[in-house]
């Protein structure tokens, strides 16, 4: 069953009098429980497509349906509520707040919910345990390695039990060993916890961990050869 259904999506920006076509008729289906790698050169539109899937932007044309909801027809307020419930984001640069402990960083998405403090703490502790950092809950980002910081970032992304996990170059700022550990974790989230994952990467080594790979180049999408 498809969780993500993207049909004939176009996206363009304007710079002065110039029109820049970033996505040109992209269509893509992602199955429930799939781990998809999205590859392509710099400037190919990978992050733009990921942002559209996460409801951070809207297409110029075409349709985007995720978990039965049409994102392209939603207003800004609707999108924000939908995004908070259904999407977990993992970024290349972690984006942790340095003045908060690992646990408090993981709790941040839950501040937008009606959950009380004790329940937020409990869910953050569970997420940190899943990523193997239960013993680092009280540590600040400066006390963690880069790989550990990214694990906290992943815990923050899964703390609200999202429908879809979107990862933008999650190993791009890590050395090979730490990057492999993050890829191991993403595979485990997909395999053991049933998380549907779309991962943007330029690294073929990282893409090998996914169950399927697609390539985006000059705004058009092609399936990788089996």
Predicted regions and their residues:
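Conserved switch/coupling elements of ABC/ABC-like ATPase nucleotide-binding domains
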Residues: 218-226
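ABC family nucleotide-binding domain
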Residues: 2-217
